[in-house]
Amino acid sequence: MKINTQDLLKAGVHFGHIARKWNPNMRPFIFMKKGGIHIIDLSKTISKLEDACNALKKTVKNGKKILLVGTKAQAKEKVFVYAKSINMPCITERWLGGLLTNFTTIRKSVKKMNNIEKMKKNGTFNTLSKKERLLIDRLYAKLYKNLGSISNMNQIPGGIFLVDPNKEKIALTEAKKLKIPVFAMVDTNTDPSNIQYPIPSNDDSSKSIDIILRFVSEAIKHSISREIKNSINKKL
């Protein structure tokens, strides 16, 4: 899927924030100021997006998962849909403190949730008393809301993708602490120096978020497909 300027323009990827709210470290990625709003240089967006996609392909090729994070209203549904399409974990609700830095404990909760699902499938759940079933259902609902979308994340992810690093500060801090590569959309009010793979882009528009996620997910999907083909060829 080729990245072109016209598609990015149509999606409004170039619209930044009000100039007075800018982060000076975004200077290299700003094309101009128009009507008091910073306009992002889309040639830089394309270059950085290509760098990010290439790095994502390598990460996935090595068998690692990418954790997609977007808890703001404009991003939630997009992140969930794209993550599901490429079988990657995601967080669209509140970030649980320690999700990465205390992963062992989080993983235990995920296993508990998965065990409840097994109980329901194999019929064990139906042998319990009404009170026990009610308590387990409540526990499951709570676990699923917070952890359902990362049930396939069996180890620390090989990378984390953030729609808005300013919104996902705890996730960013935890990833940096564990030296997990960070991929992120960076608007003109964001500090890109904290991000290994910054993608200069409008992180407030649902259309902008959608197109960036589309390119990112296509890159991951391409890498997964190639690995599956290579695996099949080795067996032949």
What do these predicted ranges mean?
Residues 1-65, 69-122, 130-133, 153, ...:
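N-terminal cationic and glycine-rich segments that engage phosphates or anionic surfaces
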